[in-house]
Amino acid sequence: KYKESQDERFGIIEEAMTEYPADGFELQLNHMPYFFHPNEIGEGRSIMTDWIGRVHEVVKRNGKDKELAIRLPDRIEDCMNAGLDPETWVKQGIVDVFIPEMFNENARVKISADYSEYTNLVRGTDSRVLGTVNSSIQTDRLSEAPISMIRASAMNACDQGVDGLYVSEWFQLWPY
């Protein structure tokens, strides 16, 4: 099911991994994560898992040190409801790096982000978790967070045992 769409997206990834020097590949699955009709979510998880497996295979074919990183909703329940199954991906060893972000709100600072679902999920495996460090707060007074808020967000992630930090959605702060 949905073979044509899968193959089209996979072809782009395969070209990027085989024709260009790359350290790996990152999938952004958190922006509008609506991949399947609500009646097809269960079947969709299996479809997406098979596709993620194909992507992982092409990434590793270009070097065992190459990694597949996936940005996805920060709650596993939200992933499951979108047709994404990180629990199975960890069991199958097909995702190297998980980057949990607030569901559909990945640009906003989330000082109280909870990474425990993912750090517990990957414990004892080869998969890793990166905490996201964002800059946007979009209030009526401020667009971007002050440095103290950004540092608090980073320290919260580190205190929870993430394996590293991922600077996400800093478009307006060039040169960062």
For each feature predicted by the language model, list its residue ranges:
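Glycan-processing catalytic domains of CAZymes
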Residues: 1-176
